C-alpha cells in the first residue's frame, strides 16, 4: 500500500464522528445505573464507526483489552487502506456516566503507524500543564515546588493557581500538600483525560497532578503533541510481573520519566473528543425533541489547528445508531 501524506485527509473530522456516536450511545444510558451496559454499548458503537474509515488502524493502549466481560475492540479497525495507529477511549468515566455524574467523555486518536508508544496497563503518576507554563514542572520535585513554579510561569499568585486532582484515597497526602501552599484545588471523581485537557487548555485548571492509568497517559501525550503543553509521567511497578509486562512493551528502564516525545514520535497525529456528561473540558449531550446536540473538540499535530464543534443530530432523518 502506497503511503499518502497525512495532511491529505482531515483525520480529526473522520474520528470525531466515532466519538460523537459513542457519546450519543452512552448518553442514552446516562444515569440508569447500568455500568457494564453503558461501557459495552459505547465500545461497540465506536468500533462500528471506526470500521467505516478507509484505513487499517492498529488499536494501541486499550485498557480493557483481554477482559472477557467487556466488549473487545478488534486488534485492527477500518475497511483497509493506509496503516495507522489508533487509540480509543469510547467512554471515559463510565461509572460517572452510568450514575448520572459529570466528566464523562469519548476520545479517539489517530496517527501514522508506529507513532504511538504502547504502554502497560499499570498505574502512572502524571503532571500536566499547558504551553504557557512551559517546561517548569519536575515530577521528582514535591507538589508545592511544582505549584509555585507554575504560578511564577503564569504570572499568578500561588493562591490563584487551580490544581485538578482525582478525588481518591491515595491522593490524600497530595491534596494536603497542595493545600498547604494555598493553591486552589478542584477534585473530580473520574475522568483524568478530561482533567488533563482542562489543564492543557488552561480553561478550568492550571495543573493536573496525580495517579491514573498509563494508557490514558499516552492519549494525553497525543493531545499535547497537537496543542502544546508539557507532560511528565512515571509508571509504578509493584512486582516482577508488572516489570515483565512493561518489558513486553519495550520498556526496560523502570525509573524512566516519560515525556511527550517518549510516547508520541510523530506530528502526524490527530485527536477528537465528545462530551457525554458536562465535564471539565466539554459539555455533555443534550437531547432535543427530534435528536441531540453534541459538543466536540478536534486538534491536529502538524498544524496545531484545533476546533470546537457543536453538532445537531436529527434522528428522524437518518438515525446514526
Predicted region positions:
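Acidic beta-strand-loop-alpha-helix segment within the catalytic core
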Residues: 109, 113-187, 292-297, 302-318
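Short glycine/serine/threonine-rich phosphate/pyrophosphate-binding segments
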Residues: 90-99, 104, 172, 193-198, ...
Amino acid at each position: 500500500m502506497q503511503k499518502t501524506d497525512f495532511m491529505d485527509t482531515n483525520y480529526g473530522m473522520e474520528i470525531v464522528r466515532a466519538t460523537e456516536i459513542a457519546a450519543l450511545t452512552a448518553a442514552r444510558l446516562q444515569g440508569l445505573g447500568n455500568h457494564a451496559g453503558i461501557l459495552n454499548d459505547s465500545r461497540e458503537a465506536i468500533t462500528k464507526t471506526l470500521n467505516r474509515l478507509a484505513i487499517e488502524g492498529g488499536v494501541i493502549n486499550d485498557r480493557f483489552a483481554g477482559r472477557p466481560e467487556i466488549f473487545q475492540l478488534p486488534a485492527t479497525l477500518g475497511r483497509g487502506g493506509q496503516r495507522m495507529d489508533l487509540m480509543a477511549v469510547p467512554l471515559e468515566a463510565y461509572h460517572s456516566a452510568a450514575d448520572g455524574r459529570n466528566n464523562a467523555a469519548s476520545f479517539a486518536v489517530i496517527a501514522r503507524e508506529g507513532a504511538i508508544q504502547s504502554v502497560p496497563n499499570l498505574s502512572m503518576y502524571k503532571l500536566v500543564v499547558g504551553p504557557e507554563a512551559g517546561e517548569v514542572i519536575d515530577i521528582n520535585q514535591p507538589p508545592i515546588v511544582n505549584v509555585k513554579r507554575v504560578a511564577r510561569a503564569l504570572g499568578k499568585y500561588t493562591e490563584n493557581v487551580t490544581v485538578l486532582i482525582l478525588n481518591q484515597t491515595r491522593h490524600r497526602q497530595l491534596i494536603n500538600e497542595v493545600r498547604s501552599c494555598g493553591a486552589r484545588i478542584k477534585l473530580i471523581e473520574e475522568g483524568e483525560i478530561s482533567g488533563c485537557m482542562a489543564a492543557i487548555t488552561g480553561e478550568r485548571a492550571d495543573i493536573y497532578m496525580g495517579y491514573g492509568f498509563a494508557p490514558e497517559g499516552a492519549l494525553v501525550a497525543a493531545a499535547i503533541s497537537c496543542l502544546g503543553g508539557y507532560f511528565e509521567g512515571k509508571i509504578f511497578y509493584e512486582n516482577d510481573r508488572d516489570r515483565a509486562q512493561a518489558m513486553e512493551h519495550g520498556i526496560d528502564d523502570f525509573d524512566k520519566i516519560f515525556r511527550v516525545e517518549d510516547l508520541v514520535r510523530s506530528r502526524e497525529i490527530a485527536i477528537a473528543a465528545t462530551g457525554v456528561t458536562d465535564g471539565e473540558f466539554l459539555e455533555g449531550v443534550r437531547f432535543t425533541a427530534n435528536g441531540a446536540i453534541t459538543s466536540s473538540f478536534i486538534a491536529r499535530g502538524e498544524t496545531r489547528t484545533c476546533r470546537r464543534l457543536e453538532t445537531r443530530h436529527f434522528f428522524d432523518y437518518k438515525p446514526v445508531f
